[in-house]
Curated annotation (Swiss-Prot):
Cofactor comment: Binds 1 Mg(2+) ion per subunit.
Name this protein carries in UniProt: Shikimate kinase
UniProt source species: Histophilus somni (strain 2336)
Biological role: Catalyzes the specific phosphorylation of the 3-hydroxyl group of shikimic acid using ATP as a cosubstrate.
Principal location listed in the UniProt entry: cytoplasm
Keyword annotations from UniProtKB, A to Z: Amino-acid biosynthesis, Aromatic amino acid biosynthesis, ATP-binding, Cytoplasm, Kinase, Magnesium, Metal-binding, Nucleotide-binding, Transferase
Secretion signal span: none
Amino acid sequence: MAEKRNIFLVGPMGAGKSTIGRQLAQILGMEFIDTDAEIEQRAGADISWIFDVEGEEGFRKREERIINELTQKQGIVLSTGGGAIVSKDNRNYLSARGTVIYLETTVEKQFQRTQRDKKRPLLQNVEDPRQVLEDLAKVRNPLYEEVADIILPTDEQSAKLMANQIIDLIDNLKI
């Protein structure tokens, strides 16, 4: 990769965006930023608390402001929250300001990867988390596909291998 163009990772919770993003940034010598971590740092509170106090709408407003700001930086690998693409503005920011990689995974893999994670507000205090994941996938998967320059399944490979695959795919795109 000759120039350090922004790389934006989108996909559902549990797809591996943060893990793969860290690997990718390390290999490329780029800055890694996780939007959820950035939101928590700026708010001085975790995402579950923000959801409890401000609701999902309040959280999404914070997320949109941060994505608008961060996507204007140069040479970053940005891991977005699973619902970031619901916002048309976010989809526009991501598409216009970098290469968007959709890290695709199955609902079953998502469920396995998130079932013990207490930092997933949309999966807390629900009767059937798997059904929630299926419902989210129906709404969000077409939006991930819409915004993606590259779609990459993440179910069976290591983060380092996935990061190297992304580099190869971006090089082949000649973006």
